[in-house]
C-alpha cells in the first residue's frame, strides 16, 4: 500500500527514467491498491504485492540488467506476465494496466491511502457511500460528521481521519530509511567515481539511522578542480536544481527527495561531518561544552580565538571537549554526552554480533520461498540458526496454519535438520493474540514447538487499558517466547497501538519473555525509545527480520540501526547467543 515517502506517487511518467527496483515495486503496489479498491480477485492482488516485495528486496538492478541485454533472473512469484510488466515499466516508467486502472477510477483516489487507517477496502467504502475521491472530499465528509455513520468507521475513526489530514498538511515529506538508503547508496557510489573525489560520506538523519529521512546531506572532500559539483547537478535522477555553487549545491530528485552536497576542505571534514550528522540538540550540547572551555565549535572546525585547534576528524572534535567519539546513532541529546563523560557509553551492537533470526515466513503462508531456501539464504548471510514462524489460522489473508498444517511442518523441519549442514531450523509459529488475549492455537500444538512468537494483527483500536490487558494475558500464556512488533505499527500507514509499554516490559521481565525489534523497514518496531526502555528494564530484545523472502535478510542492518539507536549492546539482544546458549532460554518460555 502506498504511504507517505513511498516513491510511487512520483514515478508514473515515462520521462522519469532510468527506473530503479523501488520504482518497479511502487508500480506493482499501486496496481494492487487499485485492484483492491475495485474489489477484484484477492489472489491477483496478492500476486502484485508479493512481486513488489520481491523486486524491492532484490540486490541487483533489474533495469540495468535489461539495458545490458541480459535476461531477467527467475524471481519467486514472478511469472511471465509480471516479468513482461517489469520490462514495460523499465522502458516506459509505467505500464498499460496501471494506465487503464487510472482511467477507470478517480485520478486522486490513491491519495486517500496515505491517510493512516485507510486501506483499499475503506477507500472503496468511502467512495461508494459518500463519493469521496480526494483528500479534500475526505476532509469535508469528516468535518460534517458523515464518516462516523458508515459501517466499520465510527466516531473514533472519523476523529483520527481529521487529525491525520491536519498532520499531513503540517508535516514535511519523509522517506523510510530503506528507501532513502537506496538513493544514498547510489549517489555515494556515483559521486565516489567523479575524478578528484577523495572521500564521500552521507551524513544527517540517515547516518543516525532514523527510521524516516527528510533529506540527504552528503559531504565530499575533493582535489582542487574536481568537477564534482557539475556532475552532481547533472545526475540523471535530478528533477530540479534548487541551488548551485562552488562549495554547496542542492537538488530535488524525481522521487521528491532533496539532496544537499557540500564540498569540505580536509582540515574541516570532521567538524563538518559532526555538524551535519546532528542531531541539532546534540550539537548544541557539544557547543556548550566547548564554550565552557573557551572554544568555538562549528562546521568549519574547533577554534580558540582565530586559531583552529581541531576539526579534521570527528574524534578531534569530541576530544576537544574531553569526550570519546560517540556513535552517530546515539547523538540525540538523550544522555549520551553525560554517559560519555562518565565513561559509560554503551558499545552498540554490530550486525556481525547476530547469530540467528527468530522470525520468518515461507511459502506455507505468505512467504515466497521454501524452508530450505530460507535456511540456506540465512546461512549465506552469516547466520547459524533461524526460526520458521508462520502465521496462525486466524490470519486467513496470509493462509495461516491450522494445527494439522503446523504439525506437518514440524515433521518437515525435523527432516530438513537431518539434511542441512551449518544452519539449524527452529520450529516456531507467529500466533495471533486474539482480542481477549488468548492465543490462536491450543497448548497441545504449541508445546511441540521450540518457540512461540505472539503478535497483534487485529483489533488495533482497543482502548489503552484493554489493549494492555490483552497483551499481558498473552504474556501469561503457558507457551509464549517473543512479543512480535509490539506496537503493531506500520510506518506512515498505521499508528502504534495504544498500550502501556512499561507495564508490558515489566510483565515480560517477570515472566521471562522477550520482545522483538522487527527489522522490516515498514515496521522497525520496537522503536528506539522503547528498545532503550527494554534495556533499562532488563528485557532481552530479539532483532529479527520477519523475512518473507530470501532477500529479506538484508533488512537486518536496519534492525541493527534501530537497536543501536536504542543503546542496545550485544548482550541485550537474544539472538546474539549461540544456539547452545539460546536453547535453554527458549525452553524456559515453553514451560520446560
Model feature map: region roles:
Residues 1-18:
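Short, basic, low-complexity termini and linkers enriched in Ser/Thr/Gly/Pro
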Residues 16-40:
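Charged, compositionally biased N-terminal leader segments and the immediate start
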Residues 18, 42-249, 256, 261, ...:
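Accessory alpha-helical DNA-binding modules that contact the DNA backbone or grooves
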Residues 31-38, 58, 168-171, 459:
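Alpha-helix C-capping/helix-to-loop hinge sites
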Residues 67-71, 103-104, 392-394, 430, ...:
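Short linear capping/connector segments at secondary-structure termini
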Residues 177, 363-364:
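Short acidic-aromatic active-site loops that bind/stabilize oxyanions
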Residues 202-205, 356-360, 430:
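Two-metal-ion RNase H-like nuclease active-site motif
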Residues 209-362, 368-382, 386-388, 393-423, ...:
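Charged catalytic cores and adjacent phosphate/nucleic-acid-binding surfaces used
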Amino acid at each position: 500500500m502506498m504511504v507517505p515517502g513511498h516513491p510511487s506517487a512520483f514515478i508514473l511518467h515515462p520521462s522519469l527514467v532510468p527506473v530503479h527496483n523501488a520504482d518497479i515495486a511502487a508500480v506493482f503496489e499501486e496496481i494492487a491498491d487499485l485492484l483492491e479498491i475495485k474489489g477484484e480477485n484477492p489472489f491477483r492482488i496478492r500476486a502484485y504485492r508479493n512481486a513488489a516485495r520481491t523486486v524491492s528486496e532484490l540486490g541487483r538492478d533489474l533495469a540495468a540488467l535489461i539495458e545490458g541485454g541480459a535476461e531477467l533472473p527467475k524471481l519467486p512469484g514472478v511469472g511471465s506476465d509480471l516479468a513482461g510488466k517489469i520490462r514495460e515499466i523499465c522502458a516506459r516508467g509505467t505500464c498499460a494496466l496501471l494506465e487503464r486502472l487510472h482511467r477507470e477510477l478517480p485520478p486522486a483516489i490513491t491519495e486517500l491511502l496515505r491517510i493512516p487507517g485507510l486501506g483499499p477496502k475503506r477507500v472503496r467504502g468511502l467512495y461508494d457511500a459518500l463519493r469521496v475521491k480526494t483528500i479534500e472530499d475526505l476532509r469535508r465528509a469528516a468535518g460534517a460528521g458523515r464518516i462516523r455513520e458508515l459501517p466499520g468507521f465510527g466516531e473514533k475513526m472519523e476523529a483520527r481521519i481529521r487529525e491525520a489530514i491536519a498532520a499531513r498538511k503540517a508535516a514535511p515529506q519523509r522517506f523510510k530509511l530503506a528507501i532513502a538508503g537506496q538513493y544514498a547508496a547510489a549517489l555515494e557510489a556515483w559521486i565516489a567515481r567523479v575524478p578528484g573525489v577523495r572521500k564521500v560520506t552521507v551524513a544527517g538523519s540517515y547516518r543516525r539511522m532514523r527510521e524516516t529521512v527528510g533529506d540527504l546531506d552528503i559531504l565530499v572532500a575533493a582535489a582542487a578542480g574536481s568537477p564534482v559539483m557539475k556532475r552532481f547537478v547533472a545526475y540523471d535522477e535530478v528533477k530540479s536544481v534548487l541551488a548551485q555553487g562552488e562549495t554547496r549545491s542542492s537538488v530535488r530528485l524525481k522521487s521528491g527527495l532533496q539532496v544537499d552536497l557540500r564540498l569540505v576542505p580536509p582540515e574541516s571534514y570532521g567538524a563538518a561531518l559532526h555538524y551535519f550528522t546532528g542531531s541539532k540538540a546534540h550539537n548544541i550540547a557539544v557547543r556548550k561544552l566547548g564554550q565552557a572551555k573557551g572554544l568555538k565549535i562549528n562546521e568549519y572546525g574547533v577554534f580558540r580565538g582565530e586559531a583552529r585547534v581541531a576539526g579534521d576528524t570527528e574524534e578531534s572534535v569530541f576530544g576537544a571537549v574531553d569526550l570519546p567519539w560517540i556513535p552517530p546513532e546515539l547523538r540525540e541529546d538523550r544522555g549520551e554526552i553525560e554517559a560519555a563523560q562518565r565513561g559509560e557509553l554503551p558499545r552498540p551492537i554490530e550486525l556481525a554480533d547476530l547469530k540467528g533470526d527468530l522470525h520468518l515466513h515461507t511459502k506455507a503462508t505468505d512467504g515466497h520461498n521454501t524452508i530450505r531456501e530460507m535456511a540456506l539464504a540465512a546461512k549465506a548471510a552469516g547466520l547459524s540458526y533461524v526460526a520458521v514462524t508462520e502465521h496462525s489460522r486466524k490470519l486467513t489473508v496470509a493462509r495461516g496454519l491450522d494445527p494439522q498444517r503446523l504439525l506437518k511442518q514440524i515433521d518437515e523441519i525435523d527432516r530438513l535438520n537431518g539434511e542441512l549442514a551449518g544452519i539449524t531450523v527452529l520450529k516456531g509459529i507467529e500466533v495471533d493474540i486474539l482480542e481477549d488475549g488468548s492465543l490462536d492455537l491450543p497448548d497441545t500444538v504449541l508445546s511441540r514447538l521450540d518457540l512461540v512468537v505472539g503478535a497483534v494483527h487485529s483489533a488495533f483500536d482497543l482502548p489503552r487499558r484493554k489493549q494492555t490487558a490483552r497483551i499481558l494475558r498473552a504474556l501469561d500464556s503457558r507457551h509464549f517466547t517473543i512479543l512480535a512488533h509490539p506496537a503493531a505499527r506500520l510506518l506512515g500507514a498505521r499508528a502504534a497501538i495504544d498500550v502501556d509499554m512499561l507495564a508490558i516490559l515489566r510483565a515480560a521481565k517477570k515472566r521471562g519473555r522477550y520482545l522483538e525489534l522487527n527489522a522490516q523497514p515498514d515496521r522497525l518496531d520496537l522503536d528506539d525509545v522503547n528498545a532503550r526502555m527494554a534495556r533499562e528494564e532488563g528485557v532481552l530484545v530479539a532483532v529479527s527480520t520477519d523475512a518473507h523472502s530470501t532477500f529479506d535478510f538484508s533488512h537486518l542492518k536496519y534492525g541493527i540501526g534501530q537497536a543501536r539507536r536504542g543503546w542496545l549492546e550485544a548482550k541485550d539482544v537474544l539472538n546474539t547467543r549461540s544456539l547452545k546458549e539460546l536453547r535453554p532460554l527458549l525452553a524456559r518460555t515453553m514451560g520446560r
